[in-house]
Every structure is written in structure tokens, then in C-alpha cells.
């Protein structure tokens, strides 16, 4: 080979080799963009605001700037934040199993029987078994049909209690009630009857003073649970600091967990005594009876936790999932209607057309109440019970929307932001139930198959109680709107302020004036 040609060829080969080597040394995986301003050690924690910060709104604003998928450094933890339905679909389909675990937080440890409450439990054989039992024995269509009388009777008694209050106050003019508190009592009654076979509130003196005291303790403890699980705890970002409990939150969590445990232990002991002296009635069994039968058959003995813990933790999961969330959604629905009076009238007119005023609304009427169904969907869109769903954790490395998500990363899905996407919804921040009848969202369902609308989540970690929730929401709202005329004092608009937490609780009471709009005998 000519010397001059060889001297030219060698540098070219060296250049190509160096270029290929550098290319091979480039990062194999690309991570989602991260907001600027991260600090050493704490990462992005300071950007998420204080304890009164509405995290889903803060993350929504970040997504407007950094895109639908972004990375956050939360102390020693890495998080992957999702803010679009396209990225969420990738999480809950292709990567659903890889992202199916839960982070081991202080709240789940201290208030959830050391991660035994299946809604907060890491992915495991125990989680699968407890979710399966809860789904089949309480939340399946067959079981819900068997327990229909509980749901219907509690709504009926709740409506009757409101009528009695109006009647006792003279029965001639509207009476003021705190609907938020009434809805909380009604939904707690319902789920406690299904789980433990007892009721707490109302019923014209049918509840003992002892049960009333326990009810207030339970209601207070549940409220504390949802508050504590939704606030920032230092040890979740820096596990090595758990011992110091710098904020005092872990002490509060332990106390709240203990308060709930006392109540649950009392329920189980009462059932033991009843079974000892009266035996069981299979068709009328509540969930504790079902769980105790499984324990007696040895079907809980092979699990990670002892039978008593398995029963208490699963009952707690059902109580938490079935009370506060339904009450909150109904509170927002009525608040939205009071601020949109023409829609309130339209909903009541629809009920009058299909039901009339000579009988009460029944489950079988709901399929004809199309506008009422749309109201519930629109409420769940604007105020999803879990605005960030439950945090997930990657069990293995995976790729989401082209971005690398390493094992151990926490997944945060901002459903609140996804369900206000202007590319999907016209006037996304406005209350427009019609969008689910003739508008852009008429084909959307809430069961997790349409990622543009998934208030109950999607995939393996979706809420197993969505069917029960929808039944409660539909019949509860229908019976209230059918039974009462409702307005605010001096027709003032309802304060729509939100409180921070795992859910979206209304910050202020919902004090309204009610009066009957159907005949008296329908309340008896």
C-alpha cells in the first residue's frame, strides 16, 4: 500500500474507533427530565411546599413546564411522576406487574399492621391472597347482591334521619344540616355493617350509647389516618432518621394505629363470643364472620401474618376504602350542584320523570337516570378520591414512555392532572356532566379501561371496591335529590376549598337548608 495512502487511512480508523468507543460509553438509558433547583441531599423536596400544600396541584404545575413524565429526587428516593393518560397507559399495561408494589412507608408500618393492610402492602403472596378474599367475599357482584339490603337500608335510614330533623324543627320551613357530616356517618354505617354487622349512627335511638362513643372514636381515628398518610414524613425520604421522629408524625401514627386496633380487636372478640354461643348463619354472615370461618378452616395459617392480624388488617382496608372516599365524592357532587343550580334542577327533573314522587328511588331506576350518572362521573373527574392514586414502587428495572425507571423508583400518577387534560376535555376545569352523555367523553367508563378517566386506578392495584362505590354514589345521590329540596343560606356559593391529604377532603362543612319534596309516608 502506498505510504501516503496508509498514513491517511490510519487516522481515519483511529477516529472511527474513538467515536464508536465514546458512543458505547454513553448512558444506555435515558431518564425523564427533572425540574431544576434540586438541592444536595434533599433533592426536590423543598419544591413541594409545606404541610398545607396541595401536592397534586403543585405536581400539575411542574408537569406544565417539564412534561407528562418527570423525575424527582425525594431525599434518598427517586420518583417517576406521570401526568398524561398516554404515559399512564404504558404504566398500567406493559409495565403493570413491574410497577405493582408499594413503598414501605412509615404510615403503612405504624397504622397498617406492619404493611399487612392490603391496600398499602408490598407486592407479595399475602397481598394477592387478601385482595382475593376481600374481592370474592365482600366485593364480588354475587356478594354485593346479597348485601344489597344493607346498602339500601342505610341510605333509607339516613334520609329518614334528615326528615326527622326537619320535622322536629317545626316541619314548616327549611332546616340547616351539615351534609358533609351526615354523609360521613351514613357511609361509615354502611361499610361497618357489611364488615362487622353493626351500625353506629342515627336510626331513631337504635344505637346504644356505648356504640355511639365507639363510633365517634372510629370516625376520628379514620380522619387522622387519612390526614397522616397524606402528609410528608421525614423518615420516608430518609429512613435512617426514623429513630429521631423529627416531626412527631410517627408518634401520632402509632397512636392512631393503636386506637383503630382497639376497635377492631373489640369487633373480633364480640364475634368470637357470638360464634361460641350462637354458631354462624352463613347467608347472613358479615365479613368478619367469613374471615373467622376461613381461619378455622386453616386457610389463613400459611400466610405471612397470623390469622388475627390478617383479619384485622383486611377489615381495616375495607373500612378505609369504603367510608371516607364515598362520603367525600358525594359531598363534592352536591357542592357542585349547589353552585350550578340549573344542573341541580335538571337532575331532580330527571328523577321526577322516571320515578315520580309517589315512591322512592330504587337501584333498578339508576340505569334510566343518565344525567345523574354523568354527574357522578364528572365529580369523580374533577375530584378523584385519590388524586395521586396510591404510590407504587418498581420491583424491577423497566422502560416507561421511553424513559428508564430503575428498580425501587416510586411511581406517582397524578390522576387529578390527567383528568383535567385540555387535549381530552373541553373546558377541563368546568363542571359539565353533559360531556359524558353527548360530549367528548361519552364513551368513557370509570373502571380503569379508559386511561383518560380512572378515579379508581387501573391494573393490578386498581380499587377492588369500585362496583360498591358506584352503587353507593348513584343511589345515595338519587335518594337525597329525590327526597329534598336543598339550597345554601341566602343562596351563597359553596366554598370549594380543598384540604391536603391522601384524598381530596372538602376544607369546610357543607351547611345547607333542606326541606322535603316528596310525601311524608315515603320517609316512614
Curated annotation (Swiss-Prot):
Signal peptide: none annotated. Disruption phenotype: Increased root length at seedling stage. Accumulation of fraxetin, but loss of sideretin root secretion in response to iron deficiency. Slightly increased iron-uptake ability at elevated pH leading to a better fitness of plants, due to the presence of high fraxetin content. It catalyses: fraxetin + reduced [NADPH--hemoprotein reductase] + O2 = sideretin (reduced form) + oxidized [NADPH--hemoprotein reductase] + H2O + H(+); xanthotoxin + reduced [NADPH--hemoprotein reductase] + O2 = 5-hydroxyxanthotoxin + oxidized [NADPH--hemoprotein reductase] + H2O + 2 H(+). CDD domains: CYP82. GO terms for molecular function: fraxetin 5-hydroxylase activity; heme binding; iron ion binding; monooxygenase activity. One of its GO terms (biological process) is response to iron ion. Its cofactor is heme. Its main location: membrane. Expressed in both primary and lateral roots under iron-deficient conditions, except in apical root zones, and mostly in the root epidermal layer. Belongs to the cytochrome P450 family. Plants overexpressing CYP82C4, can hydroxylate and subsequently glycosylate 8-methoxypsoralen. This is Xanthotoxin 5-hydroxylase CYP82C4. It comes from Arabidopsis thaliana (Mouse-ear cress). The lineage of its organism: Eukaryota, Viridiplantae, Streptophyta, Embryophyta, Tracheophyta. The gene is CYP82C4.
